[in-house]
Amino acid sequence: NTFGLTCFDPPYVLKGGAGKFDDMNRRYGVGAELTERRGERSRKEALFDLVEDGLTEAARITRPGGWVLAKAGRGIDGGKLVRTDDLMVRTGEDMGLTVLTTLLLLSRPRSQAHRGPQKTPRANFSTLIVFEVP
């Protein structure tokens, strides 16, 4: 109950491993660290646990009437859309937080390596969710 405003930018990148995101994955705990932490659960379930735990802590340290700003994104896992922004809204509301508004940051899509036909929509935006703590 200390801060009037808390910002929370959790990991929402489902893919970990080799590549240019290695350092980011390591810092966010979504590389080998997430693999070790998840045990028998899927990578997505373990990542969702991190998001839920982080939002819970952000709300705990925010004083009543204060705001939690939470950034979320969408991704593709196994050809299926993963809606981390929806998970965060549900989690916050289940905790008693009020969603004041959501803001979308649209970005210009980057060219992607050709891996065959596009099977899923490109979600080239991030969501900022503004919660109020009761």
Task: List where the protein language model places each region.
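Class I S-adenosyl-L-methionine-dependent methyltransferase catalytic core
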Residues: N1-P134
